[in-house]
């Protein structure tokens, strides 16, 4: 039975790691798609705090503001839970450009960096020094 518990624990950790990687890919996809939409028709999907859902609206004039609007559909939506910690009040997505620290395992953090004129997305899935993924989205 002990072997089964070890195998199960390994499976659940692997599933959580895969969920973090999937969330990372989703964040990059959503941000890129929404910023492309801004370039095409000056529209963007953003979280509506009154209706508690994502809705199409006119884009902001600033790139960094539009990044925040695009990401709000993820980081404000309560359906996205931290795969490693369901009671994490920040959820799976967090608007920040830093790599989440080991206390924040399971989070995907994205934000515009004005000092580098780009968007950094970082996701942590473990306690190791290299247990995270980074994607840089250049300004376009």
Question: Where is each model-derived feature located?
Answer:
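Periplasmic/extracellular, small/polar-rich flexible segments of pilin-like filament-forming proteins
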Residues: 36-140
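Context-gated lysine
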Residues: 13-16, 21, 29, 52-53, ...
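N-terminal alpha-helical signal peptides/signal-anchor transmembrane segments
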Residues: 23-42
């Amino acid at each position: 039975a002990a072997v089964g518990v070890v195998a199960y624990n390994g499976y659940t950790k692997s599933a959580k790691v895969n969920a973090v990687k999937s969330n990372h890919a989703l964040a990059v996809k959503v941000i890129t798609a929404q910023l492309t939409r801004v370039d095409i028709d000056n529209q963007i999907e953003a979280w509506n705090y009154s209706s508690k859902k994502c809705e199409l609206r006119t884009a902001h004039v600033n790139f960094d503001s539009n990044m925040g609007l695009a990401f709000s559909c993820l980081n404000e939506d309560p359906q996205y839970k931290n795969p490693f910690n369901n009671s994490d009040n920040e959820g799976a997505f967090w608007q920040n450009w830093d790599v989440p620290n080991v206390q924040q395992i399971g989070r995907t953090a994205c934000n515009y960096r004005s000092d580098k004129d780009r968007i950094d997305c970082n996701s942590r899935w473990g306690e190791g020094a290299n247990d995270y993924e980074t994607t840089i989205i250049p300004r376009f």
